[in-house]
Amino acid sequence: APSLSAMSDVEQGMDAYQVRRGNPNLKSVTYFTNRFSVSYRNKWMNVDLSARYSYDDKPIMEETIFENGKFVRTYANQKGLHRLMCQTSIQVRPFKEYLSINMTPFFNRYISQGNAYLHTHSNWGFRGSIVGMYKHWVFMADMNTSYHDLEGETITKGESIHSIALGYNKGKWAVQMMVMNPFTDDYHQGRENVSKLAPNKQLAFSKDFTRMVMLNVSFNLSFGKQKQMA
């Protein structure tokens, strides 16, 4: 849902060249969604295939115009927004409960139809994890590539992240050590505005989230008497 400032006749300066303006004439939006899924299961593996298509009719999305020497970023009911999201989830258990391998490749396709623009964007990605257990020991590793989203004229690019963890669980107490992003020197996410009039990019990055070590210790404390009821 749009914010109150987007629906009001209010203008706010962003910098020397840009202003943000609301639109009190915004109208309601109609949404359509279709889903498809199929699954296969046996003793050693699970396979899930899913797809979702959604269409927003006359969605409220951004647009940029040039007025009085400044770029005005405002909102309007645009023509349409198409989203197609497909993924295949595969779980393999080669050694029963001792080892589980999960792999999920995905594909997203976006078509943003504005009154004065047309933008398309495709996003291929992958999520995966490995969980191994033996007696009291637990090993985990996972990774996620960047997940993108296009709405209006803005592409949002999420984080790419991976981790490795080793833990020991004794029942009443457990300890786990995890390393975040051990195989990269850079952590980042960003936004890109693809307007023809005033495109821009924003990138947030940090080296503090690479090779970050975390230690987690937990205890199960019980007090008082315990009785078993027949």
Outline where the language-model segments fall:
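Transmembrane beta-strands of outer-membrane beta-barrel pores
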Residues: A1, E11, F32, N42, ...
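Outer-membrane beta-barrel signature, preferentially recognizing the C-terminal barrel domain
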Residues: A1-D48, Y55, R73-L84, L203-R211
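Outer-membrane beta-barrel translocator domains and adjoining extracellular loop/strand segments
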Residues: S3-E11, Y17-R20, A51, P59-N68, ...
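Outer membrane beta-barrel strand-and-loop segments of large Gram-negative receptors
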Residues: R21-N23, K27, N46-M103, Q113-H119, ...
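Residues on the lipid-exposed face of transmembrane beta-strands in outer-membrane beta-barrel proteins
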Residues: L26, F36-Y40, A51, C86-P94, ...
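Residues that define the transmembrane beta-barrel architecture of outer-membrane proteins
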Residues: T30-N34, K43, G80-C86, L118-F126, ...
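Outer-envelope beta-barrel architecture signal
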Residues: K43-V47, L84, F95-I101, W124, ...
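C-terminal beta-signal and adjacent terminal beta-strands/loops
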Residues: K170-A230
